[in-house]
């Protein structure tokens, strides 16, 4: 009996050591983000349908809609690629199709016609509590590796909202980091710079190509604008953040896509190109060589 007990104890100890070693060997999410070589910004309609493993299996970093993605779909993407999956969460505007719209409705400011949504009064404690206590935790509980925040730069057009946005971003940073997870934002090179310590990464849209909502047309950015965008990319890289770049083009624009990828890569960002509604997913990731 003593011999049997001793054998069980030895096996348990070996398994315990092996488990600890495996855990120690597994890189952190921050390390995996730093090593990511490909990126997909996939929040458009239809991006969560079909065979997600096949669609996203080659991407190291994938952003999908945090509300629409069920836990099983998050797991399917993570399992197929072994990569990171972040939940898209708009914290600077209020979208009428969200499940929390009625709760957020009292905090609406002016209407943003381009996207059919309202800027949010982030100075209001009630709005911040809604995001911090209800919306963000619900997303993280689905197994996401972190959050991807949109419209944190709304303070550029609504400067009075700066204190509230800083408080909200700081709170979200604490929320994700307490869980060992990640926080990314996008755009707002000036607005997000004072908040950079709260982020692990940032995405810059419209580096080389963008979309004009008034003309309903894609257009090429001027050389000076591209140079400024590249300067911002390098600035955030120097601060230790992972940087991605998203450009918008119509389908089958092969030459323009090459230009967008080259401009992003030359500045040090992971490139991505899609339509303005982010519905088009490339068969293969865009890579820097």
Task: Enumerate the language-model features and the residues they cover.
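Positively charged n-region of N-terminal signal peptides that target proteins for export
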Residues: 1-4
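Signal peptide processing junction and immediate N-terminal pro/mature segment
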Residues: 19-25
